Amino acid sequence: QTYLKEVKKTSISIDKTQNKVIEGNQNNLIQNLKYEVRLDQENQYIITSDLSEITYENDIEIVKMQKVTAIFIDGKNIPLTITSDKAIYNNSNYNTNFSDNIQIEYLNNVILSDKMDLDFNNNVINIFGNVQYDGIQGSVKTDNIKINLITKKIDIYMDKDKNNVEIITKK
């Protein structure tokens, strides 16, 4: 008698690469950590750091990163590159809070700020704290820039209504 058994293969893809684990702490310290996340068919998010500490809050992996580079690639394959001194990355929803010396580059545009939140739950980027934008058309100083990742709509506004956004055009 011959019995046939159907075997199903399950493929598991690991998103994070790590080069060196530093011992001696209850939390895991990792050098050169990299996460690659395919958000959907068209959008990809890659984040790397020189040094990271992995902790767990309510069974969710939270990664405190130092010397961070993140790249968000949309359907048009145009990268939005973010660098910062620090970031906190949530591995369950990929939301990332960047802080200290943030530089955002997209096409020929550069934004500098103190803080930035990349919120995939609401598909929005919030840039705040000493925001300075420099592009081909000119430069802007403001308190906040909000970018909708779906519609690409950009809101530029101040914390207080009595303050004005400063715009300098290039001629």
Task: Pin down the residues of each PLM region.
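Mature-chain termini and adjacent capping regions
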Residues: 1-171
